[in-house]
Amino acid sequence: MARRPLVMGNWKLNGSKAFTQQLIAELKTELAEITGCDVAIAPPVMYLSEAEIALAGQSTIRLGAQNVDINTQGAFTGDISTAMLQEFCAKYIIIGHSERRTYHAESDQFIAKKFAALKTAGLTPVLCIGETEAENEAGQTQQVCARQIDAIINSLGVEAFNQAVIAYEPIWAIGTGKSATPAQAQAVHAFIRQHIAEKSQAVADQLIIQYGGSVNDTNAAELFSQPDIDGALVGGASLKATAFAEIVKAAEKAKA
């Protein structure tokens, strides 16, 4: 089945009020003609209000967020609930990013709880999975990805991946300038889809699987030419309007 591509920008810990306003103004101009690709941006949560205001009057670019908590309210200092994100019209919520897994010791099981919280709230989880360089060199890529996916399936069932997104981000390629070759990325994406298909072909067929890890305006077109790469989760290049727009346009063209 034809899957509509999704390109999402993860701003990480970058930006300011002025930066948010300026970048979104530039993106609105650059992406004004886009009709064949879904687009989302995830600024730091402090700038969601600024971003929501800046995005008013257009429907091409959707808001997302970089994190969510499993609790809905209460004594959880520094956390963000699904309801808070919904108030700013955030739709696509990143969970399981390797930086959260590494720096905040988030386990597969904890990430599964975040996934459940998002599904309950009607938000779209963008589940990041991927292996370290050591795991890659040891031939454990499929094993690691399967484990991270199975944490969701074992807790919520494979149907939880309906209207959800998986972002395959090999940790050795994030922010390093290294990127998996299109063939390498496609092989992992095909494995991910087949792993889901073993439980449900219908769920696998509709699942958006993004690639992340040093995606830029130079390598995007070749990555998107692969049949199981349905878009990208973009880091550094999402902070530059022209580069991010080129990635979106490459996805639209490749999947037309």
From Swiss-Prot:
Complex and partners: Homodimer.
Query: Any idea what job this protein has?
Result: Involved in the gluconeogenesis. Catalyzes stereospecifically the conversion of dihydroxyacetone phosphate (DHAP) to D-glyceraldehyde-3-phosphate (G3P).
Q: Name one GO biological process term.
A: glycolytic process
**Annotated pathway:** Carbohydrate biosynthesis; gluconeogenesis; Carbohydrate degradation; glycolysis; D-glyceraldehyde 3-phosphate from glycerone phosphate: step 1/1
Q: Which reaction does it catalyse?
A: D-glyceraldehyde 3-phosphate = dihydroxyacetone phosphate
> Which E.C. number(s) belong to this protein?
5.3.1.1
What is this protein called in UniProt? Triosephosphate isomerase
Binding residues annotated for substrate, in chain numbering: 10-12, 175, 214, 235-236
Q: Which HAMAP family match?
A: TIM_B
Q: Which family does it belong to?
A: Belongs to the triosephosphate isomerase family.
Q: Could you tell me which cysteines form disulfide bridges?
A: none
Per its UniProt record, what PANTHER family does this chain match?
TRIOSEPHOSPHATE ISOMERASE
Q: What is its main location?
A: cytoplasm
Lineage, highest ranks first: Bacteria, Pseudomonadati, Pseudomonadota, Gammaproteobacteria, Pasteurellales
Q: What's the name of its gene?
A: tpiA
Recorded source organism is: Haemophilus ducreyi (strain 35000HP / ATCC 700724)
**NCBIfam families annotated for this entry?**
tim (TIGR00419)
Annotated catalytic residues: 97 (electrophile), 169 (proton acceptor)
A GO cellular component annotation here is: cytosol
Annotated TM spans:
none
GO molecular function terms here? triose-phosphate isomerase activity
User: Where does it localize?
Assistant: Cytoplasm
The record ties this protein, via InterPro entries, to:
Aldolase_TIM, TIM_sf, TrioseP_Isoase_bac/euk, Triosephosphate_isomerase, Triosephosphate_isomerase_AS
Q: What is the uppermost EC class here?
A: isomerase
Report which superkingdom the organism of origin falls in.
Answer: Bacteria
Q: Which UniProt keywords apply?
A: Cytoplasm, Gluconeogenesis, Glycolysis, Isomerase
